[in-house]
UniProtKB/Swiss-Prot annotation:
Keywords: Cytoplasm, Protein biosynthesis. GO terms for molecular function: ribosomal large subunit binding. The lineage of its organism: Bacteria, Pseudomonadati, Pseudomonadota, Alphaproteobacteria, Rickettsiales. This is Ribosome-recycling factor. It holds the Pfam family RRF.
């Protein structure tokens, strides 16, 4: 039973970590990255399509993204979706491709991005701690109902705390790497 709780804890915390990674993937560093455009949705064909479903995105150099739209009839909608994504990007249409030259990040922009990054990290840490709290309450109920022994209770609390600490270290490590990318590139 405790093994199931431990597994459930790891799974829930892993989902939180993956969500954090997805959040920070869209934060721009000084380098061009195709993942910068992952969250963009294009309104075409009477519905919504992710950009990577209607075009291929490649990096040509450190500052340039090249978007090859597969259906030239929707290139205007793709350009508008990029403009409306509030990423401070200026797409230029060249035939059936769109070129985006990323502007240099100002110090003010870098600081704003780092602040946003810290906000994502803190939200992830809070989510991890909330998962820990829920699991600890579940373990305490089991101990009160005599479903587990006192020793198992204390061992489980220790293991859950270790899992929590490991996941918070992952968040802090990724935060540090991304922060250095933003500030130093």
């Amino acid at each position: 039973m405790l093994k199931e709780i431990k597994t459930k804890t790891k799974e829930r915390m892993l989902k939180t970590i993956q969500s954090f990674y997805n959040d920070i993937k869209g934060i721009r560093t000084g380098r061009a990255s195709a993942s910068l455009l992952d969250g963009i949705v294009v309104n075409i064909y009477g519905g919504h399509q992710k950009l990577n479903q209607v075009a291929g995105v490649s990096v040509t150099d450190n500052k340039t993204l090249l978007i090859k739209v597969w259906d030239i009839g929707v290139i205007g909608e793709v350009k508008n979706a990029i403009l409306n994504a509030n990423l401070n990007l200026n797409p230029v249409v060249e035939g059936n491709t769109i070129r985006i030259v990323l502007p240099d990040l100002t110090q003010e922009t870098r600081e704003r991005l780092v602040k946003l990054l810290h906000q994502f990290a803190e939200n992830a840490r809070v989510a991890i701690r909330n998962i820990r709290r829920d699991i600890m309450e579940e373990i305490e109920r089991m101990q009160e109902n005599k479903k587990i022994s006192e020793d198992d209770f204390h061992n489980a609390k220790k293991e859950i705390q270790n899992i929590t600490d490991d996941n918070i270290k992952k968040i802090d490590g990724e935060l540090s790497i991304k922060e250095k990318d933003i500030l130093n590139y």
